[in-house]
Amino acid sequence: MRIILLGAPGAGKGTQAQFIMEKYGIPQISTGDMLRAAVKSGSELGKQAKDIMDAGKLVTDELVIALVKERIAQEDCRNGFLLDGFPRTIPQADAMKEAGINVDYVLEFDVPDELIVDRIVGRRVHAPSGRVYHVKFNPPKVEGKDDVTGEELTTRKDDQEETVRKRLVEYHQMTAPLIGYYSKEAEAGNTKYAKVDGTKQVAEVRADLEKILG
């Protein structure tokens, strides 16, 4: 089962990706992890990626596609894989198709921007332990304090409203066009496309995914 997850940052993809991996026994492929692993392994592609990154440039789509092809040929991808964060653009999706990387399901996590802002901006973190709270949805027992240690909670830089809104604008400009692209692919019978209501509770979203994926 080969799956692509689409949706804005904060739409709940990460939580559900974990569930899909465990339930269907497929690995999650993140381009960031893949690039780091390739550089570490010193493979031909890894060396190319390292040279580009050392020069402070963005890795080309061609190189990322080559890495994806190499990664999905590995044993743990025999039953499929889960792609999150790639493709991000229509040229990348086209390049994937040309490289013969077919996808069974494209799942779009649909959550209104304002709810995403609410979800992310309300996060509070206990940095030493990694415990995460939310002022509205999962508040600590004492406001601003970690439940276990009583230490101060902080807000991550990435969780500040200005940053979140900037990322949402980027998503709508760059990645949202993929929704139309994959809807057309589904109409042509090349993949299955499903919209998932990401505003529901985690368990409800999980149940919806089980219905879609079987």
Curated annotation (Swiss-Prot):
Q: Does the keyword DNA-binding apply?
A: no
Q: Any idea where this protein resides?
A: Cytoplasm
Note down the stretches annotated as region NMP: 30-59
Residues recorded as binding ATP, renumbered to this chain, are: 10-15, 123, 132-133, 200
Assembly and partners are described as: Monomer.
Q: Which PANTHER family match?
A: NUCLEOTIDE KINASE (PTHR23359)
Q: What is this protein called?
A: Adenylate kinase
